[in-house]
Amino acid sequence: MQHKLLINGERVSGEGEKQPVYNPATGDVLLEIAEVSAEQVDAAVRAADAAFAEWGQTTPKARAECLLKLADVIEENGQVFAELESRNCGKPLHSAFNDEIPAIVDVFRFFAGAARCLNGLAAGEYLEGHTSMIRRDPLGVVASIAPWNYPLMMAAWKLAPALAAGNCVVLKPSEITPLTALKLAELAKDIFPAGVINILFGRGKTVGDPLTGHPKVRMVSLTGSIATGEHIISHTASSIKRTHMELGGKAPVIVFDDADIEAVVEGVRTFGYYNAGQDCTAACRIYAQKGIYDTLVEKLGAAVATLKSGAPDDESTELGPLSSLAHLERVSKAVEEAKATGHIKVITGGEKRKGNGYYYAPTLLAGALQDDAIVQKEVFGPVVSVTPFDNEEQVVNWANDSQYGLASSVWTKDVGRAHRVSARLQYGCTWVNTHFMLVSEMPHGGQKLSGYGKDMSLYGLEDYTVVRHVMVKH
């Protein structure tokens, strides 16, 4: 099993303290991996900085060819990656292989193409005897911090645009779910020049802090919690690094009386509970207009009750375990606090699964009020709340009354209403009559405490560049 890291083109073992990596479906330790030392963090950053001198000057074609090769080897090793992701994260194996691996491959292929389409502005004369041009150039060394919910996918989202733009990367996956990133290191070693990609292992305090605070790191990209984002922004403030933050969400799902209820039920059953709800865009905060509220709660409760939790390697499993024991306890605590309000009703679920592993039952809570913690705070588990609303104005205000601003959806047959509401929602993405749909060509990113910066799309590529003006006198 993967345990070696990648520093300056060499696969090495960490020199720091060993950390256990668990199988969340059983609670068993899969293996122990040694963290990198502070000296190894420094070596990785310096290797990336040295490699940037050449990699930053390569042609878009050359960078694209490397990204395409990496996409190909990920696709060829798709089963291996899916099995590692399933064992380390608890994801259903069929979901990892059929849903995530193709999307990951597509991200690398998209940015391979996008690398060849990134241009500055054409030259022009704005001062007599001088010609100006605008360049988009790479920044240098990017420190990327990936989360534990989609380890390989988030590694792809961070590596692909940074490399396509001509940057060099030092990636730290979550210490909870490092295995697919370490497998990626093994495959990337012979594709990219030494130092262009470096992949480390370790905790935030021991590895993340020295990495993000390193003086030669020019940009830090994080997908993680608000608390982690606040820490990194504060930690890097003195060195004025560029930061790119995706910090979670609490997606409002606005269901009007005229919505197709069957489509809503089918959608939320999938989009609210995919990956055991461990998704920052999960359809977890439903606002149902009072005319259809009771019907929606009844039908959705019946549908959610049919979701099957089970072993990740079982083809019939729809929900695996949560990622860690600590996270299981956080999710359980959030639901217990909701139940204690007295007015929130558990329609289905609401408890830990008995037996081994970190399983929580798919849960639907009805009667939640706007100010309830279950409505306002991200649970990041298989938990969906439903709140009744009266009219369009009220629900738009409630939807926007949140510290988060990542994703949202509107369900209605009224095209005018769909446009009106979508225009007023303070979220990076709004879906209409669907939810959770992501494509490489479109940007993903938030507002408010959900962060700033875009993943995927040409906008994501531009985030990893600096705009420069060059003026030539003649």
Swiss-Prot record:
Arranged from A to Z, the UniProt key words for this protein are: NAD, Oxidoreductase
Give me the reactions it catalyses.
4-aminobutanal + NAD(+) + H2O = 4-aminobutanoate + NADH + 2 H(+); 5-aminopentanal + NAD(+) + H2O = 5-aminopentanoate + NADH + 2 H(+)
Q: Which InterPro entries match?
A: Ald_DH/histidinol_DH, Ald_DH_C, Ald_DH_CS_GLU, Ald_DH_N, Aldehyde_DH_dom, Aminobutyraldehyde_DH, PatD
Q: Superkingdom of this entry's organism?
A: Bacteria
Gene Ontology MF terms: aminobutyraldehyde dehydrogenase (NAD+) activity; NAD binding
One biological-process term from Gene Ontology? L-lysine catabolic process
What's its EC? 1.2.1.19, 1.2.1.-
Q: What positions constitute the catalytic site? A: 246, 280 (nucleophile)
Q: Does the keyword NAD apply?
A: yes
Give the Pfam families listed for this entry. Answer: Aldedh
- The residues the record assigns to binding NAD(+) are 146-148, 172-175, 209, 225-228, 280
Give the pathway listed in the UniProt entry for this protein: Amine and polyamine degradation; putrescine degradation; 4-aminobutanoate from 4-aminobutanal: step 1/1; Amino-acid degradation
Which SUPFAM superfamilies does the annotation name? ALDH-like (SSF53720)
- What general EC class does the enzyme of this chain belong to? oxidoreductase
Homology family: Belongs to the aldehyde dehydrogenase family. Gamma-aminobutyraldehyde dehydrogenase subfamily.
Per UniProt, subunit arrangement is: Homotetramer.
Record's function text: Catalyzes the oxidation 4-aminobutanal (gamma-aminobutyraldehyde) to 4-aminobutanoate (gamma-aminobutyrate or GABA). This is the second step in one of two pathways for putrescine degradation, where putrescine is converted into 4-aminobutanoate via 4-aminobutanal. Also functions as a 5-aminopentanal dehydrogenase in a a L-lysine degradation pathway to succinate that proceeds via cadaverine, glutarate and L-2-hydroxyglutarate.
NCBIfam families found in the cross-reference section: ABALDH (TIGR03374), PRK13473.1 (NF010000)
The misc remark on file is:
4-aminobutanal can spontaneously cyclize to 1-pyrroline, and 5-aminopentanal to 1-piperideine.
Name under which the protein is recorded: Gamma-aminobutyraldehyde dehydrogenase
The organism's lineage? Bacteria, Pseudomonadati, Pseudomonadota, Gammaproteobacteria, Enterobacterales
